[in-house]
Every structure is written in C-alpha cells, then in structure tokens.
C-alpha cells in the first residue's frame, strides 16, 4: 500500500523568508478560504516567529489577528502551527519561565494547535521545559533538530538529541533544515534512525531551497518515513523560501507516495491574493 505524506503550508515563513511583511489581518482572512479550497494542506503555519511583531507594526492587535486567521482552518479540520524559540519565546533574548508558561496558554486560546520549538544551539536544556508548558496548555509539542553540516553534526549527534527530546515527552520531531544545507542521504539516515527510536513518532521536514539540496532531501526523508513536508507557494517559494507545493506533490506522486491532489483554480486564487 502507498505510504501517505501530508503537506504543511508554511505561510508565515514564506513571507519572512522572502523579506516581505506578513499581510494585514483583513488580507489573511481573505486568503484563508482559498488555501482551504486547495484541498491539499493538512497543516498551515499561521503565526509565531516575527508574525506578532509585524501585527504590532501595522497597529493591529496580534491576539485578535491570530484568532481570526486560525478560525477558518479549524473549521475546515486543518491543524495550525507556530514557531517559538524555546528559552526566548518569540524574542531574541531569554524570557522568564512564568511568562513562557502563560505564552503557550495564550497561543492555545488564540487557536494554535502545534508549537514548533527550536534552539539554534541544539541545546535540549533550552527546549525540554517548553514540552511541559505546551502540554499544560493543551498544545502538541513539536521539537526541532536544527540541521547544519560539520564534522561535529553527525547522524549520531542528531539521533542522540532526538532520543533525549522523545524521552522528555515531545509529541513530534521537526527536522529543521533552515539553511537548506542538509545533505539528502544524511537526512534520510537521521529520519530512519528516529523512526527506530520510536516507530510512531511524527516527523515533519522543514527546509529552504537556496543551496539546491532540498528537493532531493524531501524525497530522501519521505523514503525514510517522514510524515509531513513543509512547502511554499509561488511567488514566495524557491530562492530563500521553500520548495513549491506543485513540484513536491508531483515528485512524491511519481515516486509512489500517496499525496493529496491540488485544486489548481484555488491555487491561482491564493497566488493572486498573496
């Protein structure tokens, strides 16, 4: 039987990676129905990172903006996820523990299902407290392995990190290849190794297209057992952004995976509203 691979539209990161501002809340709520109509996304990245800061620059209330933006996806049965910086929350400097605990409760109340937590240093001590905070708030805790290429960052290095995060109770693992420099075969070995540690752990692959590895990497991680792939959409895909959903869908379908079909009329609606 074909193995299913699901797609997540990294809407927030598409804009950030293109150097563009996130749309206003009225624009977000206008494009949401067309994204849903495309029929191919199991998840959408709706907030986190620098999203709320941009809302503030627009003079918008981030709390209201995120609630209105996530609402139609929930009604359609699509999960929403956000990015957070572990010890730093949404900032670039440490945040007190009591603030971080409240932060996840607020995000859940706003309508965010999954929190993707990362530490640029790959220090699990910075990530593990967030697992408990997310669970206390009723959120799914997805913890990241930040991918780079060096003599130190071996397959064993990443598997040891994944094992510690899984033992600490994380629900999912994200292979966060944010520079797009992970080598395809290497990443396939990492994913396969994680599935050996815990067969039913959900793995989501996030990558950027710049260096040119990521289409091959997507194929390799899916062959190794990856469950979700982050994708972008033209005109904000490729380059410093992410692989386009059309290309990823075609490649995986040709490779024998079960992937969702794309409503191309809706795709063009989304493009015209981005």
Predicted regions: what they are:
Residues 1-116, 120-274:
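Catalytic cores and adjacent flexible loops of soluble metabolic enzymes
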